[in-house]
Amino acid sequence: MLKYRLSIPFIAFSFMASCQSASITEEPLESVLQENLEAPPPTTGEDVFAPDYWDDAELVWSDEFDGTELSQENWKFETGNNGWGNNELQNYQNEGNVEVSNGTLKIIAKKENVDGSMYTSARLNSKKEFTFGKIEIRAKIPEDKGKGIWPALWMLGNNINSVGWPACGEIDIMEYVSYSPNEVHFTIHSTANNHVKGTQITSGPVPLETIEEEFHTYGVLWTDKYMKFYIDTEDNIKLNFLRPNISNSDNWPFSKPFYFLMNIAIGGNWGGLEGVDDSIFPAVMEVDYVRVYQK
């Protein structure tokens, strides 16, 4: 989910000429087969490529969404109906579109007119920021399979207000568009690699038949050498992005703090590509937890 969003994702292996390494896989990856772009091994400290590197990572922050209220210490609302750079149709509200109950957060998209918008939803930003770690979000996508919604779990660089998007960097931990059910997307954006240029790093559609019916864990293993995106278990890697051998702020803006975002967009350049089916509202994305583990 881009700050300023999106045409249909461009499959990662179709732009190998750009200065990064990425791969799409159904199996765990040990490396990416791009001879001149492979990230160099670390020269100091632990080997981040070691199979057991993450075994002793410790939980440093989480929100388990227990209780009946959203934590004001952890989250803040981002509101408005400016289209969000993607011609989205919702008006993000700070009340009425979020519920915490039975151990989960519910983000609720509704069909209702508010300030000239036909729909309302919620967009939550974390107040805390993180650099590197094992990131996990366990969530369930809205069950109705009609067209028009665009749920996302993602991160943005904390310098977005000074450098803008895409220079701040974006890490899409999970995106889903409801006109294409049973599929999920993982994507990375930077100045060098973004949808405007048609060079965003993406998994493309990853089949996941139970995405609308069951909770799944969407994770990222994030170091200063790579980002590996997975579903449910760390060995189920779906996108492996290595830091370019010749890296700079244009192609690797990912060695600084990022914050979380969770939202349901409605319509827009990607989510609304095939229109909006009003029968699917209210549409609810449930989040069981957000967890950050670090070494």
Kindly label every feature range from the protein language model:
Residues 1-8:
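Bacterial N-terminal signal peptides that target proteins for export
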Residues 20-22:
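Bacterial signal peptide processing site
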Residues 16-18:
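C-terminal motif of bacterial Sec signal peptides marking the signal peptidase cleavage site
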Residues 9-10, 182:
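Low-complexity, intrinsically disordered regions enriched in charged/polar residues
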Residues 24, 28-295:
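GH16 jelly-roll
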